[in-house]
Amino acid sequence: MAQSQKNVTEDFLQSFADAFNAHDTKAIMSHMTDDCVFEASAGPDVNGEKFTGQEQVKKAFENVFATFPDAHWSNPRHFILGNRGFSEWIFTGTKLDGTKLEVTGCDLFTFKNGKIAIKNSYRKNRLPAK
């Protein structure tokens, strides 16, 4: 087993997903490397908005929870191949103005030393539900 994959299992990714559903940024960040990168599904660049390092990434996740106070990722499925992996999910959330969102998406991961080094998010672009 490669050193970069050590301790990364489907259970590890489920624990990461559980931390997101609990909106527990401390637990979320414990799954990520100190030099982690989060590439959001939207943003000004071709790869979405990029956040680097524990502080920036944590703030980005906190912003998701502030934007969608009831954010939830359901029906997760996790896959690992070497130092890469991905999770599929259905995201639901309601903005403060009442706009509801329900979309499928996935996260592509790169692992390093048993943690998530890169979380690259993708999701469908669906019109808001009325």
Describe each region flagged by the PLM.
Residues 3-6, 10-35:
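Short acidic-aromatic low-complexity motifs
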Residues 82-91:
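A short hydrophobic beta-strand element
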Residues 37, 99, 115-117:
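Residue-level signal for well-ordered, solvent-exposed loop/turn and beta-edge residues enriched
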Residues 6, 27-77:
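A solvent-exposed, acidic/Ser-Thr-rich amphipathic alpha-helical stretch
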Residues 32, 91-93, 123:
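Short beta-strand segments enriched in hydrophobic/aromatic residues
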Residues 93-102:
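Short, cysteine-centered beta-strand-loop-beta hairpins and adjacent loop/turn segments enriched
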Residues 72-73, 88, 101-107:
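Short, surface-exposed coil-to-beta transition loops
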Residues 104-127:
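Short beta-strand edge/turn micro-motifs at domain boundaries
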